[in-house]
Each structure stands twice: as C-alpha cells, then as structure tokens.
C-alpha cells in the first residue's frame, strides 16, 4: 500500500498499520510517500484556490511518475491511497495506470473543479475503489468544498454503474 502523506499524518501511521493488521491476515507493506506541496504535487490540472491564496498546480503527473518507480516488482500487488487531496490524487492515478489493484480514497477532494466530469470521460483502470466521506466535510461554508457530498455520491454511482467494485462509507 502506497499512502501519500504529509507531516501532519506521519504520527498516526503506526496506528494505521496496526489497524490494518487486525483486519487482514495478508502480509503487506505500507510505503508512506511524503508530499510537501499538496496543492501543486497532487493536483492533476491547474485550478484557482478555493480557500486561502494558493492555487492548485498541475504536478500530479510528476508525482505519479515518482510513485511508479516504487512499483516495479510485477510479482506484487499494489494499492494506493490517501486523505483529502491525496485521495483525489489516488483516484486520478487509477485513471492513468493499471498498476494499482485498488484505491483507498478517504474523504477525497472530488469537489476539485472538473474532476467528476473527468471520471465520466475516462476509463478507470483499477478493479476496486474504497471511498469515504466524513460527517463534517459537506457542512463547510465554502461553496466549492460543500459540494463534496454530491460529488462523491455521483462518482460512486458512476463507478458502480460501470462495474467497478466500489464501497462508499
């Protein structure tokens, strides 16, 4: 499992590994891929800032190229996941390559301008997708981000309709 993460999440990775071990007997490795500039490195295309002053860049292609260098052993099964913008990146990555058997997108930023349309216009290359939406995400006052609930339900419906093994919690 490759998880895109930032400094703010490093302290919880040990607990995450322990929780995964409780739930599976499958041997696994968690690779934490640290991201420094989230709005640039994880964004598939440029978009204006939706909070603060920092616009979104288009560094996802380069980030994915770096991640794929970790996935060269064809005898292994690879999964990718992340939270928020890293969840969006993980979903986007599933449309770029068939290297990842599954995607874990926790509260993904599917409100990102144009992303749901992108999902509908391209073919996903992963077999399984896990999506989650927290209790507070769609209750924000930010008009763009408050659409996350509608967007994630649309994306989930689209994936199910097209035969993808998908869970939404």
Question: Which sequence ranges carry the predicted segments?
Answer:
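Solvent-exposed loop/turn segments at secondary-structure junctions
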Residues: 6-10, 36-39, 87-88, 110-111, ...
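Active-site signature of alpha/beta-hydrolase-fold catalytic machinery across serine-
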Residues: 92-96
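Serine-hydrolase catalytic machinery in alpha/beta-hydrolase-like enzymes
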Residues: 1-70
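The feature captures the conserved acid-bearing segment of alpha/beta-hydrolase catalytic domains
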Residues: 109-169
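A conserved short beta-strand
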Residues: 99-111
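Gly/Ala-rich beta-loop-alpha elbow adjacent to hydrolase catalytic centers
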Residues: 81-86, 90
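The conserved beta1-alpha1 loop
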Residues: 2-6, 107, 133
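A general structural motif
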Residues: 27, 75-77, 100, 124-128, ...
């Amino acid at each position: 499992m490759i998880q895109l993460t930032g400094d703010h999440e490093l302290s919880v990775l040990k607990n995450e590994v322990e929780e995964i071990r409780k739930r599976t007997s499958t041997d696994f490795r968690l690779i934490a891929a640290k991201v420094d500039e989230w709005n640039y490195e994880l964004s598939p295309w440029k978009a204006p800032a939706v909070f603060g002053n920092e616009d979104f860049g288009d560094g996802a292609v380069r980030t994915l190229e770096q991640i794929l260098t970790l996935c060269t052993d064809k005898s292994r099964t690879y999964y990718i996941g992340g939270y928020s913008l890293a969840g969006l990146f993980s979903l986007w990555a599933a449309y770029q390559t068939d290297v990842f058997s599954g995607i874990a997108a926790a509260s993904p930023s599917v409100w990102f301008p144009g992303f749901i349309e992108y999902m509908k216009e391209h073919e996903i290359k992963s077999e399984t997708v896990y999506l989650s939406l927290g209790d507070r995400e769609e209750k924000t006052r930010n008009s763009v981000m408050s659409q996350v609930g509608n967007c994630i339900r649309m994306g989930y419906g689209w994936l199910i309709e097209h035969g993808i093994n998908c869970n939404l919690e």
